[in-house]
């Protein structure tokens, strides 16, 4: 009897990363990465998806393995139940594209789909920093802020597939995403330095300055940690998870904002989780997205 293997597709706005794994999270073969372009037609993008899946399948020893399903983590917003991309600002030709049905018809395999942020955290919850825990909340910190909730090995989607979408929540003079995101880090730095927007630096540049001991950069990350603590406190007080996982490019600067975040967070949450809830970084690296997507197929969700 052949062992089952599952394909995961991490479908982002600029790239598609596809890989295969077992139900235990062991990666089979080499993941395949292809770039996408905003000028690509929907047909061209769909072909990139199918080509990458086929390339991954070709690496699998079919004498010992059989493909049991495909999971996709897709940039959105998306209609999870029907498997349709509703809107994709970076790939406008994919608006209202029925990706799940198209992939299912092409490969004649079961296909499962969720949004990319959910899948990244799902991978971490099952096989990464949250493995073995039954209640996980994760944040993806990059260009924007994403949030996902995993309970009893299932993603909490909500009645309209919008659970944990905290980015538009009102905060100070705007939304929480205005402060807890890559653009938020740049905004904080500009205000500390009293710079014009044209002189703005990216979060990566500000992290590099902090590495060199730049005072304004260090102040920026300290302030960012204070704002992040607010977002994290909302979810802890509401969900009471075992653990909070931070992923995305900004999490790479964890050492610069962790102290400020922890100090402010513990004051804003209930006493028991204040003592027990851990905040950790994601550990699966760039493969987390396709691992979480493949896990959709493993668990048939």
Predicted regions, residues:
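ATP-binding/phosphotransfer module of carbohydrate and carboxylate kinases, centering on a glycine-rich
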Residues: 1-69, 78-84, 101-111, 126-133, ...
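A charged helix-plus-loop insertion that forms the helical arch/lid used to bind
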Residues: 85-95
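A short acidic/small-residue loop/turn micro-motif
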Residues: 35-37, 93-94, 163-165
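Glycine-rich phosphate-binding loop of actin/hexokinase-like ATP-binding domains
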Residues: 131-183
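Short clusters of small/polar residues that mark proteolytic maturation junctions
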Residues: 32-33, 90, 160
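Short beta-strand segments
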Residues: 10, 71-75, 114, 138-144, ...
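Adenylate-forming
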Residues: 120-126, 149, 169
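Active-site nucleophile and cofactor-binding loops and adjacent substrate-binding regions
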Residues: 90-92, 112-118, 138-141, 280-286
């Amino acid at each position: 009897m052949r062992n089952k293997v599952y394909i995961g597709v991490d479908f982002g706005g600029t790239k598609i990363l596809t890989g295969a794994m077992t139900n235990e999270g062991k990666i089979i073969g080499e993941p395949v990465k292809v770039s996408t372009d905003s000028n690509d037609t929907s047909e061209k993008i769909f072909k990139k998806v199918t080509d990458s899946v086929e390339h991954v399948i070709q690496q699998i020893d079919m004498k010992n393995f059989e493909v049991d399903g495909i999971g996709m983590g897709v940039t959105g917003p998306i209609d999870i139940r029907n498997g349709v991309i509703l809107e994709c600002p970076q790939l406008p030709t994919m608006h209202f594209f029925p990706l799940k049905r198209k992939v299912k018809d092409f490969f004649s395999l079961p296909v499962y789909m969720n949004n990319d942020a959910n899948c990244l955290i799902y991978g971490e919850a099952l096989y990464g920093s949250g493995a073995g825990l039954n209640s996980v909340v994760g944040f993806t910190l990059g260009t924007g802020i994403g949030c996902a909730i995993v309970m009893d090995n299932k993603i909490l989607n909500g009645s309209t597939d919008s659970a944990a979408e905290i980015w538009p929540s009102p905060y100070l003079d705007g939304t929480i995403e205005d402060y807890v995101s890559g653009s938020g880090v740049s905004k904080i730095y500009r205000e500390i330095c009293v710079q014009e927007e044209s002189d703005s630096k990216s979060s990566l540049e500000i992290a590099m300055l902090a590495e060199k001991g730049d005072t304004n950069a260090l102040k920026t990350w300290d302030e960012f940690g204070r704002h992040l603590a607010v977002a994290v406190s909302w979810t802890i007080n509401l969900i009471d998870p075992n653990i909070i996982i931070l992923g995305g490019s900004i999490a790479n600067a964890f050492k610069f904002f962790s102290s400020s975040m922890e100090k402010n967070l513990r004051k804003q949450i209930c006493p028991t989780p204040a003592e027990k809830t851990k905040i950790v970084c994601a550990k699966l690296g760039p493969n987390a997205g396709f691992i979480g997507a493949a896990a959709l197929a493993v668990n048939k969700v």
